Structures are given as structure tokens and as C-alpha cells.
From Swiss-Prot:
Pfam families: Ribonuclease_P. The lineage of its organism: Bacteria, Bacillati, Bacillota, Bacilli, Bacillales. Consists of a catalytic RNA component (M1 or rnpB) and a protein subunit. One of its GO terms (biological process) is tRNA 5'-leader removal. The gene is rnpA. The keyword tRNA processing applies. This is Ribonuclease P protein component.
Length: 115
């Protein structure tokens, strides 16, 4: 993911948590915040230490980033997203993780996601 598509700073995460709306399924919680002045979407990832050691957490983050890269044309621009991974993600394959991510994005009201 390019730098323009990332949320890195703590205050940006907090803004999305406090002002954004959340949608969840068993594997993910997605917070989204509209930012019309922004030309593209931005994603922040959070994987708790409860999920596993650093190897497991980084694997989950890599799979989420790859899914986002494949879905980038279908994700609404002008929004900030914070994706929080839950415990079941640790045992999922890439295909299952991507399918679950698409499901939670659809639940959040994104109409352009078709896969």
C-alpha cells in the first residue's frame, strides 16, 4: 500500500474511532469516517497482541494489505478506514480473510464492492 493510503498517526486513529461509524463481523471491526476533501481512501490496521505473536500479527496485516491492494478500485475514495482484526483471523487462509473483509465492507454500505 502506498503512503497516501495509510493512516499512521495515533490522533488520526482516534478521530476515526470517535467520529466514525463501525461495522463488524466475527473476524473484523471496520470504522469508517467520511472525508470529502480527501482525494483517496486511507486505511489503518490494528491487530491486538491477544491474537498471537509478532509473526502471526504481521502475517494478518500483510494479508489485509494485499486484499486492500486488490480491492482498491472498488473502495470508496474520500474515506478513512480503521480495520481491527479479531482472534479468528489467526487461523484463516488468504481467501477466507479476503472474503470476510469484502463481507464487512458490504455491511458498512459500500456499494461498489462486487466480489
Amino acid at each position: 500500500m502506498k503512503k497516501k493510503h495509510r493512516i499512521k498517526k495515533n490522533d488520526e486513529f482516534q478521530t476515526v474511532f470517535q467520529k466514525g461509524k463501525s461495522t463488524a463481523n466475527r473476524q473484523f471491526v471496520v470504522y469508517q469516517l467520511d472525508k470529502e476533501e480527501q482525494p483517496n481512501f486511507r486505511i489503518g490496521l490494528s491487530v491486538s497482541k491477544k491474537i498471537g505473536n509478532a509473526v502471526v500479527r504481521n502475517r494478518i496485516k500483510r494479508m489485509i494489505r494485499q486484499s486492500i491492494t486488490e480491492l482498491k478500485d472498488e473502495i470508496d475514495s474520500g474515506k478513512d478506514f480503521v480495520i481491527i482484526a479479531r482472534k479468528p483471523c489467526a487461523e484463516m487462509t488468504y481467501e477466507e480473510l479476503k472474503k470476510s473483509l469484502i463481507h464487512v465492507f458490504k455491511r458498512s454500505g459500500m456499494k461498489r464492492i462486487k466480489k
